[in-house]
Amino acid sequence: MKVKPSVKRICNKCRVIRRHGRVMVICADPRHKQRQG
């Protein structure tokens, strides 16, 4: 899980979602997981 000030999709399988008021990226590739914070 990478924590970044701005999250972006890295590949086509990345999905940007909101969870508990946080913007997150979930993906089939675990290295692409990101959270805004």
UniProtKB/Swiss-Prot annotation:
The keyword Ribosomal protein belongs to this UniProt entry's keyword annotation: yes
A Pfam family that the UniProt record links to this protein: Ribosomal_L36
PROSITE patterns: RIBOSOMAL_L36 (PS00828)
Gene: rpmJ
MF-aspect GO terms: structural constituent of ribosome
GO biological process, alphabetically ordered: translation
InterPro entries, sorted: Ribosomal_bL36, Ribosomal_bL36_sp
Name of the protein: Large ribosomal subunit protein bL36
Similarity field: Belongs to the bacterial ribosomal protein bL36 family.
Recorded GO CC terms: cytoplasm; ribonucleoprotein complex; ribosome
Organism lineage: Bacteria, Bacillati, Actinomycetota, Actinomycetes, Micromonosporales
Highest taxon of the lineage: Bacteria
Keywords carried by this UniProt record: Ribonucleoprotein, Ribosomal protein
